[in-house]
Amino acid sequence: MLKKVVAVFSSVFLIMGCGNKNANNNTENQSMDQVEKSDTEMYMLVGTYTSGESKGIYVYKLDTVTGTSKYISEVKVDNPSYLVLDPSEKFVYSVTEDDGVETSAANAFSFDKQDGKLTFINKQLTGGGAPCYINIDSEGKHVVTANYSGGSLTYFSVNEKGGLETASQVISFAGKGADTERQKQSHIHCVQFTPDGKFLFANDLGTDKIHKFNVNESGDNFLSVGNPAAFTVKGGSGPRHLKFHPNNKFAYVITELSGDVIAFDYNDGNLKEIQTIKADTVNAKGSGDIGITPNGKFLYASNRLKNDGLAIFSINEADGKLTKVGYRTTGVHPRNFAITPNGKLLLVACRDNDVIQVFKIDENTGLLEDTGHDIKLDMPVCVKFASIE
């Protein structure tokens, strides 16, 4: 996220209780009430910014081998810049990213996997401005948002109907970083449950820390401060997103400001840095997202503002270290991307030229080939997949 904020927090504290560009030559409207299922097709859900022509979340049917797609449906919601599906894929949760505390929210939807339609359930305020990331635990009972301008994270429990209860924890953070323009205060940009579900990590772009929390299934607070309370990365880095390797032994962080990928050994809630390698070689200070192929062989990191594209790395599965193998230019401002579960395609949401690009992944080299099956949509910023029933 690229915003300037001026508030500075001096302490860490816990507060309790507290239109549509959807088609081009490769994307056609799907008018059937019932979506036909094939072995290679999945739903693709896309979050957008809604200051222009987009209205909310869009659903497509994507062939995960050819890269062709069909528009299915949409649901109106303000600025759903990040989405997550629950483990059953019957419910979808999004942020409403807005700077105002009174309008920043988390939203719940039911998802009919037979007709590909989303139905709004409810929303709850996050209590922190500009929520830009949302995640859910492996049981589908607990939702957490990362609030960028609020310098906080928010916890919600999920009820039996898939709706969100009122926020029961808002955790705010202290400090600032070395970059006097971009790190004037805490900026939480990602919340990630560990593979075993015992901990939650929160990347703080503003203070160069990865905060650690214990996950408590019982007791008053779902989240409690971990030991250590945080892991610190190099000053001025701006840790943005974190992903775990499929073998659960390694974690990788993309840093927005320094343009690095940091590799960590992961063990029982602890991170040990093993490598830092450049993703952005032109000092654009706009690195965005990070992703790993399902087979664990390749890692991708997106860069924005200059030389927009994806840095491509191979992964040594023995020690977790990365080797750069290529770079693929993309459309303008690749804020987010997603790899299909079969590992064959990588789709890039290019916010500033209103397109989702569809690339084929070379299974041997990790390099990307443009399929030409672009999906035109105003300001796409998040891509997720779900199976078709």
Where are these regions (language model features)?
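C-terminal motif of bacterial Sec signal peptides marking the signal peptidase cleavage site
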Residues: M16-G17
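An edge-strand/N-cap motif at the start of beta-rich repeat modules
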Residues: E28-D63
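Short glycine/acidic-enriched loop and turn motifs that connect beta-strands
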Residues: T50-E53, E97-E102, S149-S152, T207-K209, ...
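Beta-rich, blade/repeat-based domains predominating
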Residues: E53, V77-S88, G127-S138, H142, ...
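Short loop/turn segments immediately following beta-strands, especially the blade-tip
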Residues: K61-G67, F109-G116, F156-E165, F213-F222, ...
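A short beta-strand motif characteristic of beta-propeller blades
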Residues: K70-V75, T119-L125, Q169, G175-R182, ...
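Blade-loop segments of beta-propeller domains
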Residues: Y71-G140
